[in-house]
């Protein structure tokens, strides 16, 4: 559960094993009595050619501004090929404690096939941490595992939004740049460097390495 200023966001997660690559699956979500409509998703296929979508700073501060999600969904729906995953580079919402916006956000993720039927790879921006210092809601929506402990680095300094995920011949690295760990910014940056060196070495065979974070590496201001 994630507490917000005017309610509690509750969610459940399920891990499914034994799935085959490049396969369509259908499912329903229910409580034993009430059930959703039948939904579908497709697992990643073993290929080096695929599409993905990317967006960021949708940052809705009101229900009216959630129309930005509909605009993003329209763009995704017009892609020649259904994207394998959707890359969100942060600030998907204005404040993590806005229960009303998260309710509508959850509705869109649930109802719009452009979001509901593809994987979500999310980086955490500063607004994910506003109103909720642990960014619980976006962590739940994201669903990818954080960096695990290793002798070479301290995962507490990396933040839970730091992780790597593979798609075909691509490696996607997300850095939790807004994370405020128990160390100085320079020490945290050093931990990122050590962790990335390990991950890039382990995935040297990947043709494409994509690093995503909410802030530009070379800001123009």
Language-model-detected regions and their locations in the chain:
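Acidic, histidine-bearing metal-coordination/catalytic regions of metal-dependent phosphoesterases
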Residues: 1-62, 74-83, 209
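Acidic/histidine-rich helix-loop elements
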Residues: 2, 53-71, 94-100, 181-188
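Extended active-site neighborhood of metal-dependent phosphoesterases/phosphodiesterases
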Residues: 24-40, 98-207
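Active-site neighborhood of phospho(di)ester-bond hydrolases with catalytic His/Asp-centered motifs
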Residues: 53-56, 85-91, 119-126, 175, ...
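Sec/Tat-exported extracytoplasmic proteins
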Residues: 59-62, 76-80, 96, 124, ...
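Short, solvent-exposed loop/turn segments at secondary-structure junctions
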Residues: 60, 93, 128-129, 178-180, ...
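Well-ordered alpha-helical segments embedded in enzymatic catalytic cores
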Residues: 68-75, 195
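Short acidic, glycine-rich surface-loop motifs adjacent to enzyme active sites
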Residues: 90-93, 203-221
């Amino acid at each position: 559960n994630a507490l917000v200023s005017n309610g509690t966001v509750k969610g459940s997660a399920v891990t499914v094993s034994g799935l085959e690559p490049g396969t369509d699956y259908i499912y329903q979500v229910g409580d034993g009595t009430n059930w959703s409509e039948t939904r579908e998703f497709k697992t990643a296929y073993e290929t080096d050619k695929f599409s993905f979508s990317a967006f960021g700073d949708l940052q809705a501060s009101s229900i009216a501004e959630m129309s930005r999600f509909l605009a993003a969904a329209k763009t995704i729906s017009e892609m020649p090929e259904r994207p394998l995953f959707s890359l969100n580079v942060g600030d998907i919402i204005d404040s993590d404690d806005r229960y009303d916006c998260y309710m509508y956000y959850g509705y869109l993720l649930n109802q719009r096939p452009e979001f509901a039927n593809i994987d979500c790879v999310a980086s955490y921006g500063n607004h994910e941490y506003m109103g909720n210092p642990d960014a619980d809601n976006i962590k739940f929506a994201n669903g990818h595992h954080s960096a695990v402990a290793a002798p070479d680095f301290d995962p507490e300094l990396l933040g839970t939004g730091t992780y790597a995920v593979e798609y075909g011949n691509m490696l996607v690295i997300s850095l939790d740049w807004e994370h405020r760990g128990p160390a100085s910014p320079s020490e945290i940056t050093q931990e990122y460097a050590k962790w990335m060196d390990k991950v890039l070495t382990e995935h040297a065979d990947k043709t494409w390495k994509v690093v995503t974070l909410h802030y530009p590496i070379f800001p123009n201001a």
